[in-house]
Design a protein with these regions (language model features):
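C-terminal amphipathic/interface module of NAD(P)-dependent oxidoreductases
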Residues: 269-315
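Conserved beta-loop-beta element that borders a ligand/cofactor-binding pocket
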Residues: 119, 152-174
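N-terminal Rossmann NAD(P)H-binding glycine-rich loop of SDR-like oxidoreductase domains
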Residues: 3-23
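Conserved Rossmann-fold NAD(P)-dependent oxidoreductase catalytic core, especially the SDR/UDP-sugar
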Residues: 87, 99-141
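A conserved pocket-lining segment of Rossmann-fold NAD(P)-dependent short-chain dehydrogenase/reductase
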Residues: 181-208, 215
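NAD(P)H-binding glycine-rich loop region in Rossmannoid oxidoreductase-like domains
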Residues: 35, 39-97
Length: 315
């Protein structure tokens, strides 16, 4: 299958690209910066800009040749303060990219067969007590609005293109993301829960997320919205306890919420608040997780990558 990949040069893409190559797909990767990725065609463009999708552009030509598209594009959510300018970037990098992509798909003489588009569990808002499935309504905060607009943009694809939306939880990998930031601190023995420790963490091992995307591209039974999370969300306190145990290090030194708010402003809510997002539809499909429990996920991501089985599949 010839695939066009957007937003696949970061944390998820580092595993997704070789997994898709191993499955025999031919890849064109879009990046805003020049970079070397073995075995793929690379297009240097900013997909959030309408000009990048102009008739005759390399991006437009690649789309017209693609049988499938994976769109994970979006600036990181919780890495700096949510100033008005940064919020604009968070929205534009996701929503404008998706709108331009969908408009190009609509006008393409040969639309792709499938679009796998990212969203996030932030769609549901936050709660200390409620749990959320794909049927739960949207929340009422900034991230809910962002995810809602993102999904609406993706939902405008023509009926001829099968749409799969993945509401992604916290992606666990040792080389980046939330866990990648926590590991150096925990390894020195100074780790601990962030904020109250009672906030929920809906997580997924990166390998399982990549397997889900790989499977959804070719399995015609995938359609609609899926919570891309493991079925065992945990409170932050439990996450840190298990991480400390996996590293044989203590997890006793909490990071006070006010400190994080000082650093990230409103963006601290991503870390200090959470939700229990349950993968009801994936479980109904019988999706096979390589790491269904947190201890299995930590064992997987903390051991050498070569030991991890990455082939997609279900029971």
């Amino acid at each position: 299958m010839r695939l066009l990949l957007l937003g696949c040069t970061g944390l998820v893409g580092r595993e997704l690209v070789p997994m898709l190559q191993g499955a025999g797909h031919k890849l064109t990767v879009v990046s805003r910066r020049k970079r070397a990725i073995a075995g793929v065609d690379l297009i240097e463009a900013d997909p959030a800009l309408a000009a990048s999708w102009a008739d005759g552009s390399s991006l437009r030509r690649a789309l017209e040749q693609a049988e499938g598209v994976v769109n994970l594009a979006g600036e990181p959510i919780a890495e700096q303060r949510w100033t008005p300018a940064h919020l604009k970037t968070l929205f534009s990098s996701r929503i404008d990219t998706t709108r331009h992509l969908v408009a190009a798909i609509k006008s393409s003489p040969a639309p792709p067969q499938v679009l796998v588009n990212a969203s996030a569990v932030g769609f549901y808002g936050t709660s200390a007590t409620a749990s959320f499935t794909e049927d739960s309504p949207a929340g009422a905060d900034v991230l809910s609005d962002l995810c809602g607009q993102w999904e609406v943009a993706a939902g405008q694809v023509p009926d001829s293109t099968r749409l799969v939306i993945t509401r992604i939880g916290i992606v666990l990998a040792a080389d980046g993301g939330a866990l990648g930031k926590m590991l150096p601190i925990f390894r020195t023995g100074f780790g601990g829960p962030i904020g109250s420790g009672q906030q929920w963490m809906s997580w997924i091992a990166r390998t399982d997320l990549c397997r889900l995307i790989t499977e959804a591209l070719t399995d015609l039974s995938y359609a609609g919205i899926y919570n891309a999370t493991a079925p065992t969300p945990v409170p932050m306190q439990e996450f840190c306890t298990q991480l400390g145990r996996a590293l044989n290090r203590p997890s006793l030194l909490p990071v006070p919420g006010p400190v994080l708010k000082l650093l990230l402003g409103d963006g601290a809510a991503v870390v200090l608040e959470g939700q229990q997002a349950l993968p009801q539809r994936l479980q109904q499909k019988g999706f096979h997780y390589t790491a269904k429990s947190l201890d299995a996920a930590l064992e997987q991501v903390l051991r050498p990558a070569a030991a991890v089985a990455t082939s997609p599949g279900r029971h």
